[in-house]
Design a protein with these regions (language model features):
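Periplasmic polypeptide-binding modules associated with outer-membrane biogenesis and secretion
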Residues: 1-179
Length: 181
């Protein structure tokens, strides 16, 4: 079981807030899968993600990292140290769009939640992916932003889009009682 949890390196968020959000506490059974999920390791595209990593990334801390360390105490218990490297807050510098041949840039830009001058926000990035997929003009499986830091505090986001055929032509016919419909 977990004997204790210590947070190291957090200055942006207080320890009690991180502990509350983490949800694993002293006395709980050690479960690596749950711990990794609550820290934010694993599936990255979950829009409902309420992990510690998302907390930081939704507030501009793109390069934040959390390294859990397990210290074995006796035969049946461990202490955990959560080493947090917060880094600097990143703002969005430029937002580019490429690969769109039929859809006007302005139509696409209306769907973007990632705007120049705003703090990087992972949740808004995921919302933008859903909005672009909902347009029906682009291959949903290939909508993935290209995120490139351009300085210690600025990031460029490019949306390389691949259009899919959205034009349809349907012909239907039938017959009955000697007439053609």
């Amino acid at each position: 079981y977990i004997r204790g949890i210590k947070w190291i390196g957090n200055s942006v968020y207080p320890t009690d807030q991180l502990q509350r959000m983490f949800g694993v506490k002293a006395g709980d059974t050690y479960d690596k899968k749950t711990i990794n999920k609550r820290l934010g390791y694993g599936k990255e595209d979950n829009p409902e993600d309420m992990s510690i990593k998302s907390l930081y990334q939704n507030n501009g801390y793109l390069m934040s990292q959390i390294e859990p360390a397990e210290i074995i105490i006796g035969a049946d218990s461990i202490d955990m140290e959560m080493k947090i490297f917060e880094g600097k807050q990143f703002s969005i510098n430029n937002v580019g769009i490429s690969g769109n041949l039929r859809v006007n840039d302005e139509v696409i830009r209306r769907e973007l939640y990632t705007l120049p001058g705003e703090l990087y926000n992972r949740a808004l990035l995921m919302q933008t992916i859903r909005q672009l997929a909902g347009m029906g003009h682009f291959d949903q499986e290939k909508i993935m932003p290209d995120i490139k830091p351009v300085s210690n505090e600025l990031v460029d986001i490019n949306w390389p889009l691949e259009e899919q055929a959205s034009d349809q032509f349907n012909v239907a016919g039938g017959w009955g009682s000697g007439t053609f419909v």
